[in-house]
A protein has these predicted regions:
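C-terminal alpha-helical interaction appendages
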Residues: 2-63
């Protein structure tokens, strides 16, 4: 039970971080590009975490 709660909290934190990345990308007018890039990364590597995919996509587009 405790592990499940911790996992849910971690997932929520990841989603919050992803949203912050997307908001920052939006400030550059690149939210859609970052989102699409992250989705492509996840298709290419299903073992990649959602957060890591969005971080990589953000870093690729926001240089």
């Amino acid at each position: 039970m405790r592990d499940q709660r911790e996992e849910e909290e971690n997932l929520l934190e990841d989603e919050e971080q992803i949203e912050l990345l997307l908001e920052e990308a939006n400030a550059y007018g690149l939210r859609i590009e970052v989102e699409q890039w992250a989705i492509q990364l996840l298709k290419e590597d299903p073992n990649l975490s959602r957060l890591e995919a969005y971080v990589q996509a953000y870093n690729e587009w926001i240089k």
